[in-house]
Amino acid sequence: SGRMEIDENYGRIEDIRQNLFEIFGDEAKKKNLVLQYTINVEHENILTDTTKVKEIFVNILSNAIKYTSSGGSVKVSIDELPCDEDGYMMVRTRVSDTGIGMSQEYLTNIFEAFTREQNTTKSKIAGTGLGMSIVKKYVDLLGGTINVESELGKGSTFTVTLKHRIADESYYVKKYIEESETGSEILEGRNILLAEDNDLNAEIAEAILERAGLRIERVENGI
């Protein structure tokens, strides 16, 4: 297998979370599952391999939703932990479900490619090993840890802890300027119509854009 590399880029924790919930929202609704989350982080902007981070949680959430019966719940909690390295942050993400759970025997091999849970026919598990082996590879590559707590019939909790570089707000400015394909000198003094329905995002964007000499008018959406 080819050597995997980290492609570090700018991301916001809430954007990544929102993106994942958009992917699984319909599926959860169809199964009448409660999909909920809590976020408690001091630093919102990060530099990391956002594609691999998303892939980790796509696999975990996909299994959580797949193996949780109608009327159950999947909860995601995201917390920032103290980090001993300057300029970095630790983010712990827990995904807990009320699903069918896993046997202790299966748990010990969960991250080996192509392992499958055979113990229960009602679970109809088709084989989640490949997804989990990728998850483990990506977590290792990003210098993180993953552990699983589970009991048959009582659901599972996956805990992933990853270290990300903290991005300062200049990355946010750069992103806005790159998206508008122009330099801040050209923008200075211009009026900007900011279409953003999230109050926190809007507040951050307004502060940054005003600092770059722009006049801001905000609307809730682009319609």
Regions found by a protein language model. Name each.
Residues 7-12, 29, 34-44, 81:
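Conserved catalytic submotifs in the C-terminal HATPase_c
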Residues 26, 100-101:
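Glycine-rich G1-box
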Residues 30, 105, 159-193:
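Disordered, acidic interdomain junction associated with two-component signaling
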Residues 32, 177-223:
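Cytosolic transmitter module of two-component histidine kinases
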Residues 64-65:
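Short helix-loop "hinge" at the ATP-lid/N-box region of the Bergerat-fold HATPase_c
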Residues 102-116:
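Short conserved segment of the HATPase_c
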